[in-house]
Amino acid sequence: MSGRGKGGKGLGKGGAKRHRKILRDNIQGITKPAIRRLARRGGVKRISGLIYDETRGVLKLFLESVIRDSVTYTEHAKRKTVTSLDVVYALKRQGRTLYGFGA
């Protein structure tokens, strides 16, 4: 034990950086059947072929904005872990209140 307590904050914070896998084109991981299932849940019967790429684009923009706001809340609280409450507050800020995850 280094005597710094829980969290490891303090001296020696800037260690070696880990290699991060370069992420590209992960939006294609949202498959055609997955989009189809979401549409079915929303009551859609028939789906045009052009919908899939459009849906991926819209979903990407939505997630980027929610994640950006969530990370902002996390950084302000001087944490490194994004909590469910950070996401709830980010959604609330965008006018999409979510119940059932605290607060």
UniProtKB/Swiss-Prot annotation:
Q: Tell me where in this chain the PTM N6-methyllysine is found.
A: 6, 9, 13
Q: Which residues carry this modification: N6-acetyl-N6-methyllysine?
A: 6, 13
Processing and modification events after translation: Glutarylation at Lys-92 (H4K91glu) destabilizes nucleosomes by promoting dissociation of the H2A-H2B dimers from nucleosomes.
GO biological process: one example: nucleosome assembly
Q: Where is this region: Disordered?
A: 1-20
Q: Where do Gly residues bias regions lie?
A: 1-14
Name the InterPro entries for this protein.
CENP-T/H4_C, Histone-fold, Histone_H4, Histone_H4_CS
- Similarity field: Belongs to the histone H4 family.
Its recorded name reads: Histone H4
- Gene designation: HHF1
